[in-house]
Amino acid sequence: MAVPKRRMSRANTHARRSQWKADNVALQEVKINGQTVRIPRRLVKAAQLGLVEVEQF
């Protein structure tokens, strides 16, 4: 494991960490009850089974 040679200031630490950005969730088109909706892929099966309300997307 890498060990830093010198202490890093708080400003530099926060600047380095702020480079990580969250990506947008990929939406998938699914036909449920005759209407086409775009929902996250991980919720497709739950939406088809009726466990999740699709109107909130």
UniProtKB/Swiss-Prot annotation:
Molecular-function annotations in GO: structural constituent of ribosome
Record flagged with keyword Cell cycle: no
Coiled-coil stretches: none
InterPro entries: Ribosomal_bL32, Ribosomal_zn-bd
Keywords, sorted A to Z: Ribonucleoprotein, Ribosomal protein
Record-level GO BP terms: translation
Keyword RNA-binding attributed: no
Gene Ontology CC: one annotated term: large ribosomal subunit
Similarity annotation: Belongs to the bacterial ribosomal protein bL32 family.
Protein name per the record: Large ribosomal subunit protein bL32
Organism listed in the record: Corynebacterium diphtheriae (strain ATCC 700971 / NCTC 13129 / Biotype gravis)
